[in-house]
Amino acid sequence: MKKAHMFLATAAALGVAMFPTQINEAARGLRNNNPLNIKEGSDGGAQWEGEHELDLDPTFEEFKTPVHGIRAGARILRTYAVKYGLESIEGIIARWAPEEENDTENYINFVANKTGIPRNQKLNDETYPAVISAMIDMENGSNPYTYDEIKKGFEWGFYG
């Protein structure tokens, strides 16, 4: 038996599911468990909680789980609120996705329309998870995460 066939037979016998096309076709943020596409820090300094040990993507952070990635995003949003007073969709997205690199206005409109939250309304504990969910959708073209996963990551990052 050829090595490749033997490997596949062994994997099947062990109950290992292999879906390489699904993994490879997933958006980069989903593959990296970084659904908000947080970029690597320029200083190479402190590690995020739950950051993956293997740094295979030189541009974007990689996390052990999606909830760790959502937590990191919520941590950044907390900094935006506390340090910069950015607590609306418009304020957050203007900083998160600056015009030099993004269609910021389209991003703001997408999140506002998806959530039904006015772009200048101050966010709260009930509205942040919906905004994060819409941002994940915008960043990746889809959002496979449940409300509970997003809320857990938000609360852990914003208040933890």
Swiss-Prot record:
Compartments where found: Virion membrane
Topological relation to the membrane, as annotated: Single-pass membrane protein
Chief subcellular location: virion
Keywords (A to Z) from UniProt: Capsid inner membrane protein, Membrane, Transmembrane, Transmembrane helix, Virion
GO cellular component: a single term: viral inner membrane
Transmembrane stretches, start-end: 7-23
UniProt-recorded name of the protein: Protein P5
